[in-house]
């Protein structure tokens, strides 16, 4: 794997051009502002602990909240250092266009000893497949697109609007 190369901060929102359909006005172009999500790896005292999907904003608060709610630390002051590093997809072995963030946390030795004594089991495999993975290496995000159902081409916007008003 190539060395980790930092990126500038990743955007927490993106825009998407869409078309809105109004029963009385017809179709009109529209722009949506959407939250973005990226894989975020939490690395505790140099050991990969978990990967989760998150909007790349306020990741320090997210990481501290995770440590507190998982019982890894007892209070925020048990976390001595926190570094947030955006990483390119190429650097962490993800498909092109899926950049990631690594949050490196340094916690008190007593908290780390407790964590190592009770290796956590975070099951999250029923969702998108990211939660519960310990590091970027365990991610399988190179999935083929799901083909559209054949019947979908037969449903147009006026039909959908009529069904919603029924």
Kindly label every feature range from the protein language model.
Residues 2-166:
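Intrinsically disordered, low-complexity regions enriched in acidic/Ser/Thr/Pro/Gln residues
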